[in-house]
Amino acid sequence: MPRKLDLRSGRPVWSAYRAPAVPTSALTRDAKADVLVIGMGISGAMIAEALTADGHSVVCIDRRGPLRGSTSATTALVQFEIDQPLTALGRMIGKASAEQAWRRSRLAVSNLAGRIAELSINCRLSRAPSLYLAGTVLGPSQLRDETEARRQAGIAATYLAPAPLAARFGIERDGAILSHGNIALDPRKLTAGLLLKALERKARLYAPVEATTIEDSAKEVVVATRGSPTITAQHVLLATGYELTDIVPAAAHRVISTWAIATRSQPRKIWPDAALIWEASDPYLYARATADGRVICGGEDEDFIDKERRDALIAGKSLRLARKLGRLFPDLDTRPDFAWTGSFGTTTTGLPYIGAIPGHPRIQAVMGYGGNGIAFSQIASEIVSAAIAGSEDTDASLFAFSHRQQRHKQSLIT
C-alpha cells in the first residue's frame, strides 16, 4: 500500500485562512460501497463529488484525514498550460496527441470553474491571465514558435516583446507568452467544499484509516485496513497523491522536492491583472497573488525526497526565492511571512497517469503530476466517472498507464 512520505513541512500560506471542517467517522466494522476512494486530498475530493453526483455509493478513507497531505502545500495556480511546452510535447508524443492534451487541459480548467460556481463553493476563485516568461529552456525565438504552435492548435496566445511586456505588466524580461483562461483559488477551501458536497449525497468518510492490502478479483476489490475492518467495493480509486502505492508501475513516477514562500498582504503592489507568472526555465520560478494581496512564489526544485535534507533547506531556499521575486518585482516587499516545502511527483511529458492499473481493471489510479495537478485532477474525475459508468472518455488513452511508459522529469508545486 502507499509508501509513507511526509509530504510537506513548514508553514503553508493556506494555514492563514480557515477552511470548513469536514467531519469524519471511525471505521469500526466492515463496510461496502460501489467505490472506495483512498485519499481525501484535492484529487480524492473531486472524484468523490463526481461519483456521488452520478448516484454511486462512495466510501473515502485517508490515513491522516481530509486536507492533511500535499493539498495544503500546493500553490494552486490552476493553469491549462502544461509543464512541457506544446512544441516540446509534440516531439515527445506526436503533434496531434500533444495538441489534444493541451486542449483537454484547457477544457478541464473551464469545467472546474463552472463546477465550482454550480456547487456554490467559496474557495476564493479568481480568473487570471498567465505570463510564460522567456528563460533558460525557451528564449524569445522559441516563445514565438510556441505561440504559433498554440494558435495552430486552436489555443489563443499572444507573444509580448520586451517593450509591451514592461509597459503592460512592469516586468523586465526578454519576452513572454500571454494566455487567458486560467484560475487561482484556495485549495483547502475547494477540497473541503467538494467533500462536504459528497457528504450531502451520503458518502461515508472515515479517518484516520490506513489501507494495508488490496485484493482484487473479477467481481470486486477487498481492502484491508490497519485495525482489521475491511472495505469491499466494485471499484477502488487510488488518490494517494505522491504517496505512491506498490501496485503502481514503477516507470510511472518520480518524486522531487520543491519550496515556496508567501509575503505579507500588499494589495496595492500586485502587478496588473494579478497574472499567474511562470518561467520557461528548468527548474522554473512561478508566482501568483492571493485574494487578499499576498504574493506566493515557488520553485527551486531538486531531485531528492529525503525529508531531513529537504526541511533543512527551507531557510536558504526561502531567501533565494525572495531574491528572485525581488528581481522580478523590485517594489514588492518579498520578505516571507510563510515558508514551506513539499514532495511532489513528476513525469517526463508533464502529463498525468489516469485510469485502470495494468492487470487490475477494477483499480483506478489518479496521478495529477507536475504544475497542473488540480487541472489534471479535474480530468481524472471525468475519465474515472466515465469508466465506472461503463463508458470510455474520448481522451482516456492519452493518460492511460498502458498507453504511456514514460521517462520522467519536469516538476513543480503548483
Residue ranges and their predicted role:
Residues 1-35:
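Extreme N-terminal leader/targeting segments of oxidoreductases
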Residues 33-60:
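N-terminal Rossmann-like FAD-binding beta1-loop-alpha1 element of flavoenzymes
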Residues 38, 80, 238-239:
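Redox-cofactor binding/interface segments in oxidoreductases and associated redox assembly factors
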Residues 53-73:
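Glycine-rich FAD pyrophosphate-binding loop
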Residues 89-197:
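Rossmann-like flavin
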Residues 110, 118-126, 230-361:
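Active-site substrate-recognition segment that forms the wall
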Residues 148-149, 176-234:
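Helical element adjacent to the flavin cofactor pocket in flavoenzyme catalytic cores
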Residues 310-311, 326-414:
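C-terminal catalytic lobe of FAD-dependent flavoproteins
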